[in-house]
Each structure stands twice: as structure tokens, then as C-alpha cells.
């Protein structure tokens, strides 16, 4: 399961030969994608569309590869972050975890989490990347499985806009009622309410769900940004009800930030470096956060420290002090005296995620490392940014980054139930489903067109204007 840096030595290959192999495999992969994508959505009722000179043209073939990269990058980052999940949450209340991790802890022994009963992670004795090799299978987790369900529901119902009834039906069908069902805080409360007959968005109203400010929606809805490439306005419309299934107020705005980031990945100027793209996308997405919200103030606090070249560890420690110890800017989770001092809260985990996003500067490895070491619910930010960066560099970019091949199989039945083929899918199959969803979104929600001969989308461009959330 561990990344092996000795591949070139073991096989006695020169760097030039290795690069040539990667290049050849990339060409073969692209040819395969071109052959396979022509068969995607062949029964789609395509309306005649006359392209406009102002349309944004996006290749369906390239987007398929990017969606593959999303699922692969998300899995690598998710499982790596799981090693340190809830190892470090601070020293307030009954549960104290000592000093936070620093970059020096990478590669060193993992310490027990708050529920580890004194034992380190059973995933790895050390803090390091976790891989599913070619002949193995990635398992789903709560940072990937609800997104999988939403994609499935959009595809099954042949819609771009899920209803409360469709969300409730999907949750009840694919989530276990008892045993380990991999739901916590707001997700679990919303699920309980659905079992009682309640429909979203009522399942997140503060009067019904006391956990409305927890992390849940920001790990289950980012994918809607990819379903509306370069059009965050459409992405927010599609994601509104899924987000409001579990989140309100700051937790809702934070989730919308992530959705916008994912949509802007297809809008940003690709002539910029990936670092420049990430910084531009983050500043644009932050406009969604109301200026008087603690979410906005958290973003500004981390961004200011980053701009001042303050090391990420110091920024993380200052974030903890400012918001959990001193409860500044209206962040009053600590005074609520909830379990683990709100280690599942949307706010502190958002602040932590902005640290790994900005200081990672678009480098996949660095971003995952920082997210894994930053603390709290560490698998959530890593999964979110691993998915985003995996999308931006694609399958081949991920393989080149780690100089290895990965499994392309995914087992949704590790955490969810009642899917075909006993829950085993390939990333290519999952990406194809995404392409079919986007075909409908481009035509029905954007008023654009799909050209199956050229394998492109024509997306009407509008002025980018990110409004504050309400």
C-alpha cells in the first residue's frame, strides 16, 4: 500500500526512459478515452445548437480524464488524511491531544486519535501516503460516498436538479439504518429526520437539526461544481438543496465556497501556473462568504498570514488560539461545550483547509501533507483538495507526480449499500456518469450545446460575479 520511491532503481531504468514510458502510456490512455467517450450518452436527446463566438468550448474527452483524476486524487488524499483524523484537536475541555503536528512529523509514527484507545491508526504505523495499488480496490469513505450517491441520483433520475423527495429516497436506499453507517453529527441527524418522514431542506433547519453548523455538507457536495464547468452560478443552483440537507449559515456558505472552487477549475486561465490558478480561484470563491461571517474572517486571517510568509504551522496554531481558545469573530463553538470541542465543526475545519490549500500552492503532494498534519478532521480537507488538484492535473498528472500506477477500482459498498455489481465501479465508469450528467446540465441549465462528433461542450459565457451568500 505504500508509495515506493525505488521503482527506477529496482528496474534499472534511466529517468529518460521512465519519462518516455509515461509519455507513451499517456498517449495510449488518451486514445482509449477518445474511443470510449464517443459511446457516452449516445441516446441523449440532443437539441440543435448553433455555437456562438463567445461560447467557452470544453473537450468532453479531456474532462473525462479530469473527472477520473478527481476520484483518484480524492481517494489518495482521503485515505492518507484518515491516518491522522482526530489525532490533534487542541487542549480545551475533557479531551486534550497535546501539541499539533508539524512538517517534521511526516514519515514518523502516527499518534492515537481521540477514539483510538491509545493505539495509532490501523491504516499505517507512520504518517505517510496511502495507495491502493493496481491489483487492489479503493474503499469508499464518508468523504467520497455521499458525493457518489448524489451523482448516482442525478444520473438515475435524469435530472440536473434533485428534489427533496429524490434526496430522501436515495439516502434511505443507500445508507444503512443501523450498524456502522459512517454518518456523524448533521448527516446522522438529517438521516434520522428523513426516516421520520421529513424532507430536505427542513432537515437542516436549526430548529430541527442542532448540528447545522457542523462539517457535513462541505464533504458531500463539492462535486456539484464539476457538474457545472466554468459556471458557478449553475453549480450553486444545483448544490443548494443537497447543501441545505445538512447545513445552514456559515456551514452552508463554506460548502458553497468549495462548490465554487470546483466550478472555477474550468474557468480559470490555464496559462497561469497552478499556484496562480489556486490563489485566484480561492479569492474569487471567498467573495461568497458574507463579510461579517466568521467563515470570511477565517479566510482573511489565514490568507493574510500566508501573504506574510508566516510558516503554516504558526498559522495553524494561531488559528486554533484565535477561534477555539479566544472565540474571536463570532466563532463561539467552544462555549457550546460539545463533544471534542467541536472538532467536527465546519468553521475550524474550513480554516484548516484554507491553510493546506494556500500553503500547498497547487502542489498535490504538499497540499496533502499539510492537510494531513494540520489537525482536526484531517481527511476532509485533504479529500477536498486532493479531488480538486487531481481534477486539474488529471489521471496522468497524478501518476507522474507519484511515479506509479494506482488501482482504478472503487468499492462503494465499504460504506454504502444497494448499488449494482456489488458496489464495484471503475473510476472510468464513474467519470463517464459525470460526463452524461454534464451533457444535460449544459443543455438544460446553461442553454448551451453538446457536439458528439467533436466531443465538446459549448458553454455560454456570462460575466463572473460571485455574490455574497445570504
Indicate where each model-derived feature is located:
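Active-site-surrounding "flap" and adjacent substrate/cofactor-binding loops of secreted or lumenal enzymes
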Residues: 83-131, 144-146, 168, 178-181
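Mature, well-folded catalytic/scaffold domains that follow N-terminal targeting or propeptide regions
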Residues: 64-68, 194-205, 210-218, 227, ...
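N-terminal leader/propeptide and maturation segments of large enzyme subunits in energy/redox metabolism
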Residues: 124-140, 144, 150-179, 247-256, ...
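Accessory "access/gating" subregions that flank catalytic or transport cores
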Residues: 43-45, 49-58, 190-212, 221-231, ...
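Bacterial Sec-dependent N-terminal signal peptides
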Residues: 1-24
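Active-site cavity-forming subdomains of large catalytic enzyme subunits
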Residues: 133-134, 138-142, 146, 151-255
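Catalytic phosphate/nucleotide-handling subdomain of diverse soluble enzymes
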Residues: 76, 80-82, 86-108, 247-250, ...
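Acidic, carboxylate-rich catalytic segments that either coordinate divalent cations
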Residues: 22-25, 29-44, 300-339, 395-470
Amino acid at each position: 500500500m505504500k508509495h515506493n520511491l525505488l521503482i527506477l532503481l529496482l528496474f534499472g531504468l534511466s529517468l529518460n526512459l521512465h519519462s518516455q514510458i509515461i509519455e507513451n502510456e499517456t498517449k495510449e490512455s488518451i486514445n482509449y478515452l477518445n474511443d470510449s467517450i464517443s459511446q457516452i450518452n449516445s441516446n441523449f436527446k440532443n437539441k440543435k445548437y448553433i455555437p456562438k463566438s463567445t461560447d467557452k468550448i470544453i473537450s468532453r474527452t479531456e474532462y473525462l480524464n479530469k473527472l477520473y483524476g478527481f476520484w483518484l486524487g480524492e481517494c489518495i488524499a482521503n485515505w492518507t488524511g484518515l491516518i491522522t483524523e482526530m489525532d490533534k484537536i487542541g487542549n480545551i475541555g475533557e479531551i486534550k491531544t497535546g501539541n499539533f503536528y508539524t512538517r517534521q512529523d511526516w514519515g514518523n509514527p502516527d499518534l492515537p486519535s481521540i477514539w483510538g484507545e491509545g493505539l495509532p491508526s490501523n491504516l499505517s504505523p507512520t504518517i505517510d501516503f496511502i495507495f491502493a495499488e493496481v491489483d487492489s480496490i479503493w474503499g469508499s469513505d464518508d468523504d467520497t460516498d455521499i458525493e457518489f450517491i448524489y451523482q448516482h441520483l442525478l444520473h438515475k433520475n435524469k435530472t440536473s436538479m434533485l428534489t427533496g423527495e429524490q434526496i430522501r429516497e436515495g439516502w434511505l436506499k443507500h445508507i444503512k439504518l443501523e450498524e456502522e453507517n459512517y454518518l456523524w453529527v448533521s448527516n446522522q441527524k438529517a438521516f434520522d429526520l428523513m426516516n421520520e418522514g421529513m424532507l430536505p431542506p427542513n432537515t437542516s433547519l436549526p430548529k430541527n437539526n442542532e448540528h447545522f453548523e457542523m462539517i457535513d455538507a462541505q464533504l458531500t457536495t463539492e462535486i456539484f461544481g464539476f457538474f457545472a464547468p466554468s459556471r458557478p452560478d449553475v453549480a450553486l443552483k444545483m448544490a443548494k438543496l443537497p447543501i441545505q440537507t445538512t447545513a445552514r449559515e456559515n456551514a452552508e456558505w463554506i460548502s458553497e465556497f468549495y462548490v465554487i472552487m470546483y466550478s472555477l477549475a474550468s474557468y480559470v486561465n490555464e496559462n497561469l501556473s497552478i499556484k496562480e490558478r489556486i490563489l485566484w480561484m480561492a479569492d474569487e470563491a471567498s467573495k461568497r462568504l458574507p463579510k461579517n461571517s466568521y467563515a470570511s474572517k477565517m479566510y482573511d486571517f489565514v490568507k493574510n498570514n500566508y501573504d506574510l510568509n508566516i510558516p503554516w504551522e504558526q498559522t495553524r496554531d494561531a488559528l486554533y488560539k484565535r477561534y477555539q481558545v479566544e472565540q474571536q469573530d463570532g466563532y463561539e463553538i467552544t462555549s457550546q461545550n460539545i463533544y471534542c470541542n467541536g472538532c467536527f465543526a465546519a468553521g475550524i475545519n474550513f480554516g484548516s483547509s484554507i491553510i493546506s490549500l494556500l500553503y500547498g500552492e497547487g502542489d498535490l503532494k504538499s497540499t496533502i501533507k499539510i492537510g494531513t498534519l494540520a489537525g482536526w478532521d484531517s481527511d476532509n480537507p485533504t479529500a477536498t483538495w486532493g479531488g480538486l488538484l487531481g481534477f486539474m492535473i488529471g489521471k496522468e498528472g497524478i501518476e507522474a507526480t507519484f511515479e506509479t500506477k494506482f488501482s482504478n477500482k472503487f468499492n462503494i459498498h465499504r460504506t454504502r449499500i444497494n448499488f449494482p455489481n456489488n458496489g464495484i465501479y471503475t473510476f472510468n465508469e464513474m467519470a463517464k456518469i459525470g460526463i452524461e450528467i454534464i451533457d444535460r446540465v449544459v443543455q438544460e441549465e446553461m442553454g448551451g450545446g453538446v457536439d458528439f462528433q467533436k466531443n465538446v461542450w459549448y458553454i455560454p459565457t456570462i460575466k463572473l460575479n460571485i455574490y455574497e451568500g445570504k
